[in-house]
């Protein structure tokens, strides 16, 4: 994914440096006819983009859109994986609570190091998006 991001950024940078292709279908006779009038008309560049896909603006828009899509997909993936992890922890805690209740139908109150598993609510435990914070210490957030 990092390679794609670097390639798209390089394409965005180089699209402004790449010269357009020359227009080859203009005949020399037309240029000879209009040489006298050329001084009166505003100068036009010698090279023009042949198709819309060759224009630098369109290339920049396409590469920029691809970059935004790539970053959005990455952020969406981070949020989805965090949400699925939270749901998995909540499900595991629910299974542990059911196991505790089935083992202690008499309402046993734990003492010492025995504890009934805690209830886990994703709406209060799930953290928001903090892309600048390291995601390597996720266990400390729960």
Curated annotation (Swiss-Prot):
Keywords annotated in UniProt: Membrane, Signal, Transmembrane, Transmembrane helix, Virulence
Any single Gene Ontology cellular-component annotation: membrane
GO biological process: biological process involved in interaction with host
Endpoints of the signal sequence: 1-20
Disulfide bonds: none
Localisation: Membrane
Superkingdom field: Eukaryota
Disruption phenotype: Decreases virulence in Zea mays.
Complex and partners: Monomer.
Function, as annotated: During infection, may play a role in establishing and maintaining biotrophy; the formation of a tight interaction zone between the host and the pathogen.
Designated name of the protein: Virulence-associated membrane protein 1
Gene that this polypeptide is encoded by: VMP1
